[in-house]
Amino acid sequence: MSTSKRKRADEVQWNKRSTKKKASAPPVKKTGGKADRPSLQIQTLLHSGDTMITVPSGGGCDLISTYARGSDEGNRHTSETLTYKVGVDYHFVADAGACRYSNRGTGVMWLVYDTTPGGNSPSTKDIFAYPDALVAWPTTWKVSRELCHRFVVKRRWLFTMETDGRIGSDIPPTNQSWPPCKRNIDFHKFTSGLGVRTQWKNVTDGGVGAIQRGALYMVIAPGNGVTFTAHGQTRLYFKSVGNQ
């Protein structure tokens, strides 16, 4: 005679429920990720019309980390800033003096970090200390050995411009056609990973005289005497860090 007993229906249902896995708790969301970080601030420097950049022989140097103290997005909110990214979007146009000749030149744009600015923006010769014989050849310029501890080239870009002895408003004869040349060009660059730290004095303006340490300049020089004007904008992506 069999000694096994038939299980009751309610007992079978109980065993099925007890063997089911317990629902796991939802994962705890970690803080401090990218989504929790404050977004970068943006400052845009517009150069058009009266504020266009004139690039003479020997080039020019302009401060671009011009963060005045304030509450807007483009202002610094603390005594220290970190510039991470820079975008430059410009249209270069050879000036009338350069267009009188048939010529070609390779120009250079640099982003230069100045560890200890002295209250005034330096000239290109202050940074590179080139001899006068090389003023028209910026591709040969290097930061002087004596000042390599102060000036650091963060980025360097080349561009080529051409002239053919004519200006843009000249009209060819009906039986001729003139080939195009690069008397006006578009120049677009975007760079990240700069990590430029700027410490500010206890003042509200954003000029070079307000910087205690760490200025960022945009330096442009024409090649072979093809001087020009620059129309466009520079956009800087930065954060306000440090103490209020």
UniProtKB/Swiss-Prot annotation:
Q: Which GO terms describe its molecular function?
A: DNA binding; structural molecule activity
Give the species this sequence originates from. Maize streak virus genotype E (isolate Pat)
Sorted alphabetically, the keyword list is: Capsid protein, DNA-binding, Host nucleus, T=1 icosahedral capsid protein, Viral penetration into host nucleus, Virion, Virus entry into host cell
Q: What does this protein do?
A: Encapsidates the viral genome into characteristic twinned ('geminate') particles. Binds the genomic viral ssDNA and shuttles it into and out of the cell nucleus. Plays a role in protection of the genome from degradation, virus acquisition and transmission by insect vectors, infectivity, and systemic movement. The CP of monopartite geminiviruses is absolutely essential for virus movement.
> What is the taxonomic lineage of the source species?
Viruses, Monodnaviria, Shotokuvirae, Cressdnaviricota, Repensiviricetes
Statement: the UniProt record of this protein carries the keyword DNA-binding: yes
Indicate what this protein is called per its UniProt record.
Answer: Capsid protein
Q: Name one GO biological process term.
A: viral penetration into host nucleus
Q: Which domain of life is it from?
A: Viruses
